[in-house]
């Protein structure tokens, strides 16, 4: 998606070297500038596979990692991979299902058009340019306490 915002899909201004409009950044990340994702897609895929094997993953069937802002970096903010308690969930590309992050993001956009409430979500680039899906977690309070919520796996009576 060249020259389009990875949050709203609308065109970016001519010559802009960013992936989001400032207002879209605030909606997704809570900042006017997108945080840096300092990992390559292959590094994250290897980490996600390791996390799935160790069974310390966010529930669901896709490989995913929990992210939060690196408290040591100020401007621009940087993401770091954390345990289960991060404020964001990142879903990388998978070999089995090409373009799954893009499909999930466009599905969420279609849900919004149908007036279905969704979590803040968008696409993001790894340091090598490959796209991944990112969403802000809404199943935790600001203090990290779990909020009761159902996801599609639970609705389909699939164990996660």
Language-model region placement:
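Regulatory N- and C-terminal appendages and interdomain linkers associated
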Residues: 1-42
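Conserved ATP-binding subdomain of kinase catalytic cores across diverse folds
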Residues: 43-159
């Amino acid at each position: 998606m060249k020259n389009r915002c990875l949050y709203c899909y609308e065109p970016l201004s001519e010559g802009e070297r960013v992936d989001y409009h400032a207002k879209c950044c605030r909606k997704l990340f809570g900042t006017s500038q997108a945080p840096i994702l300092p990992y390559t897609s292959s590094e994250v895929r290897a980490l996600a596979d390791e996390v799935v094997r160790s069974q310390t993953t966010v529930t669901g069937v896709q490989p995913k990692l929990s992210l939060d802002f690196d408290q040591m970096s100020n401007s621009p903010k940087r993401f770091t991979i954390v345990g289960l308690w991060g404020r964001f969930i990142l879903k990388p590309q998978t070999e089995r299902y090409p373009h799954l992050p893009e499909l999930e993001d466009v599905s969420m956009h279609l849900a919004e058009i149908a007036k279905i409430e969704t979590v803040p979500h968008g696409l993001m680039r790894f340091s090598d340019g490959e796209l991944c899906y990112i969403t802000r977690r809404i199943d935790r309070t600001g203090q990290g306490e779990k909020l009761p919520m159902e996801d599609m796996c639970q609705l389909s009576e699939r164990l996660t």
